A protein has these predicted regions:
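Mobile, glycine- and charge-enriched loop segments
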Residues: 212-264
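Short, solvent-exposed turn/loop segments enriched in Gly/Ser/Thr/Pro and often Arg
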Residues: 217-220, 230, 285-292, 798
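Intrinsic-disorder/low-complexity accessory segments
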Residues: 26-211, 251, 257, 263, ...
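Bacterial N-terminal signal peptides
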Residues: 10-22
Length: 1002
């Protein structure tokens, strides 16, 4: 029976009230969290807590005091004041110093190094429990490992039940992944002290029944930069202070979107820690909305690949947590909200996709340690069914308030977790077991990556990501034949495919396929099948889904985005095929076949050829202008011919590039052009560096060197062409394109981003004032760079900037209406496969599109209206709708036929329109469309409504300006480490920067 919506909500609230305090059913709320009356209180510290808390109901009995200890230091030992005190933000090093003081003072605390950031800063995990539990940690971990992989106990529920009774859980808490969200480190410092020292019955129960594991600072590089910014702010009262331009070395807010691609150190360090401790929960602490939003419950749609038990755990923990804090009298605490739980890209979701429980708090914060008057908007303070006790509309908020809320929420929830630990461990086991049983229950049985002609480097990258996700990978040692049920229609095809329409009543037949030896198999009968399934499957978000505002990307299918053909197999016989486990799939394995002075490397859309060119910078490298056959192999257009290089240097470079080099007895009989080593600059603005950071990390990981410059540099550098061949201008993601020129408003004081004694961590780039933009001088310098033969590569908003400022003659932004798309994977078709940019590709490609941006092109520099056959509507006159009107009393003169261009083509001008037309672009300078959206099967994964507005429109265009080129991407080809399949579009262009000026395709 399906209850009405209001009834279901009421039922949820009833359930919440029932589960709020089952562990303390014997005790009224007033005693559930009572102190030990025999334990002394640190009166000075407690007085400061009261002083810095701006209203009594912004605290609770759990955090309105601090127990005293003669041997264990409080956070004040390092901070000089209590946690949450005004004007104090500790560096990560100081946070670590305190935790190590704790570990040195009590056997209930241990500190571990779990890795380092890209800039070499340490990340730690702190384990807190009774000394006896920590002493048993290895034995307990061995038991948890068996629950995590029930194959080790033969899937025996009885054995598992015994292990559950003997074991205690691990609850992993992470703080400050988002650097401007500053409160978690001090809250966790004080909470760790409480867990180690407090003798309140509920604390003692927590200590004796579970390990609390804490990583107080996840984004260590960004934390130290944020503290620098705050120190600058304190040293310059009354002045505007710089915004935090760089968080981590590469990305800012998107560091919490890396749980799929596993690109950043912090993601790998947290996942490895979570799995090596066999933790049951990963609870990530954030700051934004008032006063505390426990988005554990979240909103629909829920991720389609998680175990249903997790949905129940989210509901139980989230509603319980809110219920307890409501009963403690703290306003503005709620769950549900509008955060959909669809994307697995968030850090916390590492747990959800590895059989654990993902949780997240958003606590109100001020972006520093100031105490501020905060004025809320109606959407923040108005009451709704899931927010019956909303935040106050006007509030004086302090960092101490933040710490009170965060600690109270954590302490109540881990208390509930400890009291019900056997339930969570049992669920942990059953979720792991069902992951292994996936093939026989809901399927699929496996995913297979055939060992057929495809890009070795892209395939290796996909396998590497799966390996980082701790997914087991096997490889067929013999052929394997499977039969998959028929689909309603074939997977997305190129528009050039020759397909015949089926009769409406024709029944599609099951498909049988044989995979050759060497094919990779990702079995679904393994503990972490869910993350593999979520990444390798496709996603569909219905346009009429009740959730109208997706929180993040709606599609991410990795086989499409990596351009690695992968088959979803439901036939369980694949699991009986002969295969061997692969220990380090994706590791460098390129090799040179044969020996000789000339070698060829096929370009199958490899992502590593540009880096290979730099590794062999002294070699003679040429690029094939056409396909050729040599040494029994076929080589595509864009393949490399390498000469004058030592065998050792070649072998090392080829291995690292994960490609196969073939020795030739002579140079191939094919047209070649030289491949000079490009001089690259990566240009950023001082508006935002979030999205361009993904480009930098891709270049760095693929060993492509570049100079890192900014728009202010360009405004002062008149001769860019003497220094660079290519300038990359990645998406900005903030502000209108006009802000690239204008910069930030010049009101007030300068906003420096500089390394100084006061701000030693403000590095990566430098400026005395972040406000000035590119300016008109900088724009002219960019134009001069391109007109003198340089290549400017742009994407999304920087492509719109190039169009608006006249750098892309004949290219315009497609004005679409009614398109509903949020981070989806779309099909695309190559228009000019002869362009060097398209080298190594076939007819089609899957691309990531953030919002459906596309282009149109014209043969004129202004988008003048050229009437086409599609636009024509016949006038009133003789004949029917399809007939021509024939005036009376004269001979018939046939009109000039109206053009009928395709959506990706420019409308041709007739003689009348071309005569003495100063705006007509000469043919050799007309834009060249390389890639367009598909005309059918456009949506591959995610959400798309209004496809007709963007179908067949250009998305990658080579615009010609003077002697140079501006390459425009409507999509983002280098995004979150996920769009590996479109990387070569950028890299091909760079390698062929001086070979792009060819006539536009007709």
């Amino acid at each position: 029976m399906r209850l009405p919506v209001k009834s279901r909500y009421a039922l949820l609230l009833v359930i919440a009230s029932c589960i709020a305090f089952p562990a303390f059913a014997q005790n009224p709320l007033s005693t559930a969290y009572s102190r030990d009356p025999q334990q002394p209180v640190d009166q000075d510290y407690t007085a400061k807590i009261k002083q810095y808390t701006t209203a009594p109901n912004f605290n609770s009995p759990l955090t309105d005091y601090l127990p005293a200890s003669k041997t264990v230091p409080t956070p004040a030992k390092v901070l000089g004041d209590v946690s949450g005190a005004p004007n104090i933000l500790p560096y990560a090093e100081d946070v670590y110093k305190y935790f190590r003081l704790l570990a040195a003072s009590t056997p209930r605390v241990k500190v571990f190094t779990i890795g380092h950031s890209e800039e070499g800063r340490e990340m730690i995990a702190v384990a807190i429990a009774d000394e006896s539990l920590l002493a048993q940690q290895k034995e307990n971990d061995a038991r948890l490992a068996k629950l995590a992989d029930p194959r080790t106990i033969h899937m025996d529920d009885t054995v598992a039940a015994g292990l559950v009774k003997q074991s205690f859980p691990v609850y992993y808490i992470t703080g400050t992944i988002h650097s401007p969200e500053t409160g978690a480190p001090t809250a966790l410092m004080e909470m760790a002290y409480r867990l180690a020292v407090d003798d309140s019955p509920y604390i003692k129960y927590i200590r004796s029944h579970m390990i609390v594991l804490i990583t107080p600072v996840v984004e260590v590089d960004g934390r130290d930069r944020m503290v620098d910014i705050y120190k600058w702010h304190l040293a310059h009262p009354g002045e505007n202070y710089p915004h935090l331009l760089y968080w981590g070395h590469y990305v800012a807010h998107d560091n919490n979107r890396d749980a799929m691609g596993m690109t950043l150190n912090l993601t790998n360090n947290v996942l490895d820690t979570y799995l090596s401790w066999h933790a049951q929960v990963l609870h990530d602490l954030h700051e934004s909305v008032p006063f505390l939003y426990d988005n554990t419950v979240g909103d629909g749609p829920y991720n389609a690949w998680v175990d249903p038990t997790l949905n129940d755990e989210w509901a139980e923990l989230g509603w319980n947590n809110v219920g307890q804090m409501q009963n403690l009298g703290m306003p503005g605490v709620y769950t549900h909200g509008d955060f959909d739980t669809w994307s697995p890209g968030y850090l916390m979701f590492l747990a959800a996709m590895h059989n654990g429980i993902s949780r997240l708090y958003e606590t109100f914060g001020n972006g520093g340690a100031d105490t501020e008057k905060r004025i809320l908007g109606p959407d923040e303070y108005e009451r709704t069914w899931y927010k019956p006790n909303p935040p106050l509309p006007v509030v004086t908020w302090s960092q101490r308030n933040n710490n009170n809320y965060e600690q109270t929420a954590l302490l109540t929830t881990i208390s509930y977790f400890a009291q019900n630990s056997q339930t969570w461990l049992q669920n942990y086991y059953f979720k792991s077991k069902r992951s292994i049983e996936k093939p026989s229950e809901n399927g699929p049985a496996a995913y297979v990556i055939p060992d057929e002609n495809q890009s070795a480097s892209r395939r290796a990258e996909l396998l590497r990501v799966l390996t980082l996700q701790h997914v087991e990978i096997s490889r067929l040692s013999e052929p394997a034949t499977v039969t998959n049920p028929a689909k309603k229609s074939d997977d997305a095809k190129s528009d050039k495919s020759d397909t015949k329409s089926e009769k409406p009543d024709a029944k599609p037949e099951p498909k049988t396929r044989t995979f050759p030896p060497g094919s990779y198999v990702i079995r679904m009968d393994q503990p972490y099948s869910r993350i593999a399934d979520a990444l390798l499957d496709r996603q569909y978000w219905a346009p009429d889904d009740p959730q109208k505002h997706p929180y993040d990307d709606t599609g991410w299918s990795f086989p499409d985005l990596f351009s690695v053909p992968t088959v979803r197999v439901t036939d369980v016989s694949i699991l009986k095929a002969k295969m061997d486990p692969v220990a380090n799939a994706g590791a460098p394995s390129g090799s040179v076949n044969g020996s000789g002075d000339i070698v060829a490397i096929n370009n199958a859309g490899e992502i590593t050829l540009l880096g290979l060119r730099y590794a062999l910078k002294d070699a003679k490298v040429s690029i094939a202008d056409a396909p050729f056959d040599a040494a029994g192999k076929h080589f595509a257009t864009g393949s490399l011919i390498i000469q004058r290089v030592s065998a050792d240097a070649l072998a090392a470079a080829v291995k690292d590039a994960n490609v196969q080099a073939v020795s030739l007895t002579a140079a191939p009989d094919v047209a070649l052009h030289a491949a000079p080593v490009p001089r690259i600059a990566m240009m950023h603005t001082w508006l935002d560096t979030q999205t361009e950071g993904w480009w930098r990390v891709a270049l760095d990981k693929l060993h492509v060197p570049y100079d890192y410059i900014n728009t202010q540099t360009v405004s002062h550098e008149a001769d860019l062409r003497s220094k660079y061949d290519v300038i990359l201008f990645a998406p900005i993601g903030r502000g209108a394109p006009s802000m690239i020129i204008d910069g930030l408003p010049m009101y007030g004081n300068p906003l420096p981003w500089q390394k100084t004694d006061l701000t030693p961590n403000l590095t990566i780039d430098s400026t005395p004032d972040m406000r000035p933009g590119l300016g008109l001088d900088g724009l002219q310098h960019l134009k001069d760079f391109v007109s003198q033969g340089g290549l400017l590569i742009t994407s999304e908003d920087t492509a719109q900037f190039a169009i608006a400022e006249g750098l892309a003659p004949g290219v315009f932004v497609n004005r679409a209406t009614g398109v509903n798309l949020t981070g989806s994977v779309l099909g695309a078709t190559f228009v000019n496969s002869k362009s060097p940019v398209a080298a190594g590709y076939g007819d089609s490609l899957a691309v990531y599109s953030a919002n459906g941006l596309a282009f149109t092109i014209a043969n004129t520099i202004s988008p003048g209206r050229i009437q086409t056959e599609k636009d024509y509507h016949r006038p009133t006159g003789r004949g029917g709708p399809q007939d021509e009107d024939i005036p009376e009393g004269r001979n018939i003169v046939a009109p000039e036929p109206l053009p009928s261009p395709k959506p990706w083509e420019a409308a041709p001008l007739n003689e009348e329109q071309s005569r003495d037309n100063l705006f007509l672009i000469p043919e050799q300078y007309r834009p060249d469309v390389i890639l367009r959206f598909a005309s059918k099967n456009l949506l591959l994964s995610g959400l798309l409504e209004g496809a007709g507005q963007i179908e067949e429109k250009p998305i990658v265009v080579d615009a010609h300006y003077g002697q140079g080129n501006v390459l425009l991407f409507a999509n983002n080809p280098i995004y979150r480490g996920e769009t590996i399949g479109s990387y070569p579009l950028v890299f091909n262009a760079i390698m062929n920067f001086d070979h792009l000026n060819r006539p536009a395709t007709k």
